[in-house]
C-alpha cells in the first residue's frame, strides 16, 4: 500500500459520498411524503450507498478496462468506482434521454456496455451473470475478471450457491463480493442464518473465503487484490465478505424503526472521517486537503447535476426505441 494508493482510495470515497449526498437532496425535493416515488424530479425508489464506499473503492482499485461488474439495487458506489460516467449515470437516474439507458432504466437498472457494468433490483441476479462474463473471458483466453456483488441477504438465495458451485467446478475468473450491512431490508442476519460469516461458506465450494471490515479500507484493498490476482492467474474464484454499514435507510423514505438504538451509533462508524483521521495522523493528509478534496468532488457532482437537469425528457415516441420484439 503506497501513499498514492491511500490518497486515491480516500478521494474516490469522498467523490462517491458527495454524489450520494446530492442525490439525497435532489430526490427528496418536492416529495411529500418522502417515499412518494411518483413525485419530484427523480422518479422511482432510491437506494443509496453511504457508508459502503470502502467496499467499492477497495475492490475496483484492482480492476482494469474490460473487467466486468454485476451490482445490486444499491449500485452507485460500484458504478462510479468502476469508471461509469457520472453525467450519463445521473441523467439516467433523472430519467433523461442522455442517460446510460436513455432514461428507461433508472437507478436500479444502470447498464454501461463500455465498462461492462450492470445492476439489477432482483436479489442475487448478478451472480449467474458474472459467471457468464467469466466463462466468456476464460474461453477467449484473456486475463479479464468478473466481479459479482450482492448483500448478505442474497447469500441465502439459490442463485448464490449455484453460482459459487459452478464457478468452482469450471475454475472461472470471478470474485464474489458480499456487502454485509447487517440488514436485509429490515431483517437482521440472525433471523435468516445461523452462521456469523458467509466467507466460511466458500470452503464448501473449494475456494478461498475471507471476511474484512469495511471501516478498514486498506484491508478491503488487500483482500480484493489477492482475489483479483488469483482470478487473473487462472486460479479460479474467491469469496470476499465485507462487513459494512448502511448509514441511511434501505430506501429513501425508510423510517428505520427496526434499527432502534443502532441509529445513535452510526456517525462513529462512518468510514470516511475514520480514514481521513488516520491519514491526517500519518501526515498524508491535512485539514486543508480534506476541504479541497470535498470541494473538488462537489464541483464534479454539480456539473453532472446540471447536465442531467438540462437534458431532454423522453417523449412517448421514445418508448418504442430499442424495442425488438
PLM regions and their residue ranges:
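Conserved acidic/glycine
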Residues: 1-56, 242, 247, 252-325
